[in-house]
């Protein structure tokens, strides 16, 4: 059975990828975001879910969302980015610049529920990653509340926003995504996931690292970048 990682284990795996295996942050982010786009395309085809609101947070999870937006655009979707607190670092500025030159729309204000329902078919939740600890900060409350209340399907990147990485939902009102894309390996909170689709993405974990942490990851079929758990 595939291993579900604690918060500390997820951090340690990431640090070993960076420090021991010499992966760069942007290298892993590109692979993670690309795998998210592939998982979304498998579950939500463009003919029914072409208009996508991608909600990006300030850290690596948000970076994954920016990469995902670019690849979804190349796949024929019409992504719109909501990025309430951009990170002032070259990596994130470059990702934002790429999206701008790809003519991907960006909204400055969180859409109201009715506005979101009229303008979008799907929401991608790329706000918080496995380093998140509740409660949600003030600048993200509006978008988290939108995702909690909307009837649109939601695809969460690695961790559903607002969830505790190990305990899962903190409150009964916390969002319930339709698709969860676990990156590298699923986190403990994913055991509480009740949505329709659970995918694994991030096909970059070296065999030795898999053995060290007993990840027991399933084998990706052929040239697939994601697989259904």
From Swiss-Prot:
Assigned EC number: 5.1.99.6
Main EC class the enzyme belongs to: isomerase
Binding positions (K(+)): 61, 125, 161
Pfam family name, one: YjeF_N
Keywords per UniProt: Isomerase, Metal-binding, NAD, NADP, Nucleotide-binding, Potassium
GO molecular function, one term: nucleotide binding
Catalytic activity: (6R)-NADHX = (6S)-NADHX; (6R)-NADPHX = (6S)-NADPHX
Co-factor(s): K(+)
YjeF N-terminal domain mapped to chain residues: 10-217
Presence of keyword DNA-binding: no
Residues involved in (6S)-NADPHX binding: 60-64, 129-135, 158
Co-factor binding comment: Binds 1 potassium ion per subunit.
Single GO cellular component term: mitochondrion
InterPro entries assigned: YjeF_N_dom, YjeF_N_dom_sf, YJEFN_prot_NAXE-like
Stored HAMAP family: NADHX_epimerase (MF_01966)
The family this protein is said to belong to: Belongs to the NnrE/AIBP family.
Function noted in UniProt: Catalyzes the epimerization of the S- and R-forms of NAD(P)HX, a damaged form of NAD(P)H that is a result of enzymatic or heat-dependent hydration. This is a prerequisite for the S-specific NAD(P)H-hydrate dehydratase to allow the repair of both epimers of NAD(P)HX.
Protein name stated in the entry: NAD(P)H-hydrate epimerase
Natural source organism: Drosophila ananassae
């Amino acid at each position: 059975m595939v291993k579900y990682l604690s918060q500390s284990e997820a951090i340690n795996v990431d640090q070993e990828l960076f420090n021991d295996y010499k992966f760069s942050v942007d290298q892993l982010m590109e692979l993670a975001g690309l795998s998210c786009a592939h998982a979304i395309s498998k579950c939500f085809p463009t003919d029914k879910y072409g208009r996508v609101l991608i909600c990006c947070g300030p850290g690596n999870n948000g970076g994954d969302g920016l990469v995902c937006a670019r690849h979804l655009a190349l796949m024929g979707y019409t992504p719109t980015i909501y990025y309430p607190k951009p990170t002032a670092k070259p990596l994130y500025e470059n990702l934002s610049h790429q999206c701008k030159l790809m003519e991907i729309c960006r909204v400055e204000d969180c859409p109201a529920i009715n506005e979101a329902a009229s303008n979008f078919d799907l929401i991608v939740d790329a706000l918080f990653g496995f380093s998140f600890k509740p409660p949600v900060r003030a600048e993200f409350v509006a978008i988290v509340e939108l995702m909690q209340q909307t009837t649109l399907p939601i695809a969460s990147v690695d961790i559903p926003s607002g969830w505790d990485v190990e305990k899962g939902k903190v409150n009964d009102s916390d969002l319930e995504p339709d698709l969860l894309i676990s990156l590298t390996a699923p986190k403990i909170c994913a055991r509480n996931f009740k949505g329709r689709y659970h995918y694994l993405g991030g096909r970059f974990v070296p065999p030795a690292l898999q053995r060290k942490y007993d990840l027991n990851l399933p084998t990706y079929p052929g040239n697939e970048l994601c697989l259904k758990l």
